[in-house]
Design a protein with these regions (language model features):
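Short beta-strand element of the alpha/beta-hydrolase
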Residues: 34-43
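The serine-hydrolase catalytic nucleophile loop
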Residues: 44-56
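Alpha/beta-hydrolase active-site loop
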Residues: 50, 84-104
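Conserved alpha/beta-hydrolase
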Residues: 58-78
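Primarily recognizes the serine-hydrolase "nucleophile elbow" in alpha/beta-hydrolase
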Residues: 97-147
Length: 147
């Protein structure tokens, strides 16, 4: 498989009045030809660093890849309390990232995938069910499907 070079940049959004942070990995070729989008979701006690290796692999394969911290996540670049986290607050975070990233000029918004680990997998599945017209692929790694 041919790998592509990519740039990394910090991502900051405001969701329900709180900061949400993470990283985006953008293939250099996406500036001239929009690329598919993959949003990577970490598990309950994790942070974006847990799924960042997968995001970098997706970027090397030619996709714009984002890994972010759910608000309240452990070691989080985002605001919020862990005790306030739920699948629904994480779903709101994911939907905010999805909406923002689909507006980026580097992203082909007709090709969007979600990757989720553990609780992030359950949240990714919820988002895919809620937005079937926007999300075209779903990859779940040990998803917490019994909520």
């Amino acid at each position: 498989m041919t790998t592509q070079s990519y740039l990394s940049r910090q991502v900051t959004l405001t969701v329900q009045g709180q900061r949400l942070g993470g990283l985006a990995y953008v293939p250099r070729t996406a500036s001239s030809t929009p690329a598919p989008l993959v949003i990577c979701c970490h598990g309950m006690e994790g942070s974006h660093t847990r799924v960042a290796p997968m995001a970098r692999r997706f970027a090397a394969a030619g996709a714009v890849a984002i890994c972010f911290d759910f608000r309240g996540g452990g070691g989080s670049a985002s605001q919020g309390e862990t005790t306030a986290m739920s699948a629904l607050t994480e779903l709101a975070d994911l939907e905010a990232v999805l909406t923002a990233a689909c507006a980026w000029p580097e992203v082909d918004a007709s090709r969007v995938a979600l990757f989720g680990l553990s609780l992030g997998g359950a949240v990714a599945a919820l988002a895919a069910a809620r937005h079937p017209q926007r999300i075209t692929a779903l990859a779940l790694w040990y998803p917490a499907l019994r909520l």
